[in-house]
UniProtKB/Swiss-Prot annotation:
UniProt-recorded name of the protein: DNA-directed RNA polymerase subunit beta
CDD domains (alphabetical): RNA_pol_B_RPB2
Keywords linked to the UniProt accession: Chloroplast, DNA-directed RNA polymerase, Nucleotidyltransferase, Plastid, Transcription, Transferase
Alphabetized Pfam families for the sequence: RNA_pol_Rpb2_1, RNA_pol_Rpb2_2, RNA_pol_Rpb2_3, RNA_pol_Rpb2_6, RNA_pol_Rpb2_7
Organism: Lactuca sativa (Garden lettuce)
Native organism taxonomy: Eukaryota, Viridiplantae, Streptophyta, Embryophyta, Tracheophyta
Localization: Plastid, Chloroplast
NCBIfam families for this protein: PRK00405.1
Cysteine pairs bridged by disulfides in the record: none
Amino acid sequence: MSTIPGFNQIQFEGFCRFIDQGLTEELSKFPKIEDTNQEIDFELFLERYQLVEPSIKERDAVYESLTYSSELYVSARLIWKNDRRRYIQEQTILIGKIPLMTSLGAFIVNGIYRIVINQILQSPGIYYQSELNDNGISVYTGTIISDWGGRLELEIDRKTRIWVRVSRQQKLSILVLLSAMGLNIREILENVCYPELFLSFLNDKKQIGSKENAILEFYQQFACVEGDPVFSESLSKDLQKKFFQQRCELGGIGRRNMNRRLNLDIPQNNTFLLPRDILAAADRLIRIKFGMGTLDDMNHLQNKRIRSVADLLQEQFGLALVRLENMARGNIYAALKHNWTPTPQNLVNSTPLTDTYKVFFRLHPLSQVLDRTNPLTQIVHGRKLSYLGPGGLTARTATFPIRDIHPSHYGRICPIDTSEGINVGLIGSLAIHARIGRWGSLESPFYKISERSKGARMLYLSPGRDEYYMVAAGNSLALNQGIQEEQVVPARYRQEFLTIAWEQVHLRSIFSFQYFSIGASLIPFIEHNDANRALMSSNMQRQAVPLSQSEKCIVGTGLEGQAALDSGALAIAEHEGEIIYTDTDKILLSGNGDTLRIPLVMYQRSNKNTCMHQKPQVQRGKCIKKGQILAYGAATVGGELALGKNVLVAYMPWEGYNFEDAVLISERLVYEDIYTSFHIRKYEIQINQGSERVTNEIPHLEVHLLRNLDKNGIVMLGSWVETGDILVGKLTPQMVKESSYAPEDRLLRTILGMRVYTSKETCLKLPIGGRGRVIDVRWVQSSKTDETEKTESIRVYILQKREIKVGDKVAGRHGNKGIISKILPRQDMPYLQDGRPVDMVFNPLGVPSRMNVGQIFESSLGLAGGLLDRHYRIAPFDERYEQEASRKLVFSELYEASKQTVNPWIFEPESPGKSRIFDGRTGDPFEQPVIIGKPYILKLIHQVDDKIHGRSSGRYSRLTQQPLKGRAKKGGQRVGEMEVWALEGFGVAYILQEMLTYKSDHIRARQEVLGTIIFGGRIPTPEDAPESFRLFVRELRSLALELNHFLVSEKTFQLNRKEA
């Protein structure tokens, strides 16, 4: 079996390709710059360029909010010809900084980890399709797609006349295009296979007389010029440049695809569209019209290409060189105008290149902030594939066939792992063994079966090539030829599944996980789950929070070790040697006569506020080897990924508290810190130099709010802070209004011309839900070019310890998610026959309808593993060995556990996997035996502390006088429909009227109500309408509906009664 490639290898290979090839290719395109009088020549030498080692380390770049980059130096030559003398000056110049990729496969820009994800684009070339027009008649078209996405369409009508459309504009004859490209009628007829079909154009009254007329007609259609343009050489050059060179540039990939599809032998370096391409495309279109060719599947991966990090960085580098060229031309012109001596370095500077990459990493849609919720999230984010982005699709216009699974995705793109919602099918994930080939295609490995050699040779195939082979669908993966293979095996051939004899198989899969992404490959018994639930599980594993006491899973798939290793969460020994010192901050390793310092990550905040921390696992004096684990990271145990906990679970209803995916848990999970996690929140405040000052003397604030500030006005390390406490004391000066001057202030202003200033309190306060311990305070100064714009920022990091509580979200690895509804005392929880209370109670109705039966296998096998102290690593699709292999394995382990522990209730033949348990409140057994097990349950990032919100009073919108929206603004909302129903059910009419009217949004009455509640008294009854009703009236008026209203009260309402 082959070794699984590194999970970050795609990113590393892409960046290395950019450094080795991309820089050279773009520098070779840099032109020789001359002025109009040819007095100064400036050029760059691509043979000699160098990247300098960064001046800072990765950790320092994150801590100081800097960019981890390298300076690029290029050799340049300047020739200055003046007064019959020639000055030649060669110099190595700095042209900018290029961000470097870190060991995580990401970049550090302004102290933030960013990742560049891969994009799937339509590959340049020609594609033939058939569509039905309005009359229900098939119309055959051939679409030529350029390297940048422009389109040129060839269309053949019922009379076999061929028309051309440029970017979906009005169509014109193909003869016009060919004549504009320089061919005459005779050359056209001599170089096509069906000249008689082209003769129909010659009988047309609008016959193209000359090349000039063709250029004029094509230019008029292409450039949308009104009137009659006049032919000139400049017009011809303009058309040649804008259309045939810019819009019709195929690129290397497009030229290769055109040659392969049209059977041409045009040289690979000729990347522009030629008349020969148009003629061959027209001939192929005619053949397809008469049924002598095949149409193209636009969604096939052989018609797609991957735009990797190398392509994106190379494109930005080329854009920066164009700006550098313009700068050099401008400086040459300025040197000649102002008569100063230029040098290679003062003709250019590093601003264009540095700013181009800064804008790219901050604003480009494919440059995203690296998700670091847990180690798995970091790896999966770098292996994403996106149809979205510049040149790609949009979520609103993407059709269902594009989002759907295609047979060519087999072994290349995971059929399970994708986004949920509007981006479903547009954001995918690379399969484990997939790699990006030379031409941007996704390649997948296969074993080639040969009768001559006993061994199996592995080869990578691009999409389309594997369709010509009989590929065994993974039923027989053993390489030992002595094993008798099955006589009939399932196989794939030309996107169809067949059943053939083993002797007819050409290729076979190399690994049972070959089809899946990393997230899907970590799901045990995935073959027993519905695909929708497997998709949810793949996404929810990336949302798992690292726990304070991690535990590796009892039932896994075997990829947990490599996932932890490639994530960068572990500290690995790069050299062999002896440990001479270790503590929580660093490890000192002595080897080869040198002492190597290995820093450890200590309470580092991720961008999802989770805590990244490394714990050393080696002692002083221990000798280690290269590659050995020195420290475990967050969510890793024993060198394996550990995202959750193995807890005892019962599948049964319990008083309705686990209705509709609610989860009942034991208080043991709280008191023993089973699901306790640490979270680090960052609070930042900007300080303008000069005007604002940081101090601990803040007027008009209570003393206890300032208790944690030091003499400089900044919160002290180790302080425990609560909601509303001051973290940084800051005063901002503001000028007092003229009307509010005191008499003495007015006298000072009149006599001395002095302005009176006062200070406004603009402190950094701890918001709601932010209580915790201060673990770090940083004072960061941002350097700008303008001295007046220099600002400072103070960042305060607060550590929170969060136990699991009601409202938190938990999930298994099979899409079984739920919200904690109640925390029971452990004595009230259902307990097993040996007296152990269960930790969680799940609803059994959540299993059959969702068809994720894999959780039942995992639960039962986890129970057996917990009793036998064993860990299982099970590859998916184990039914390829025998029928019911998963069930047999689980039952055999349960049977062995019942024998070794002398507990027959663990495996009861009448109801295997089930056991009779007892009610903890009464001690009575439940009526039916239930399934008990030990599944691996995760605590997700969706926590109630981040979401729960309520307000009694707060800000209102000035326009509508309604409460503001959102938790961040301390907003709220009016009483909703369901709340009204609940109050109606209790019959509290007066409370309901108060809440809906003057208590909620009556501008004057709500202040009076608040005063009467505080001081006592009768709540006043307002005499006018509340603001919500007035807002409703204004909304109707905006729709041209006038609504007149008046308020009826006891004073205005009189009723005359007559006795019957």
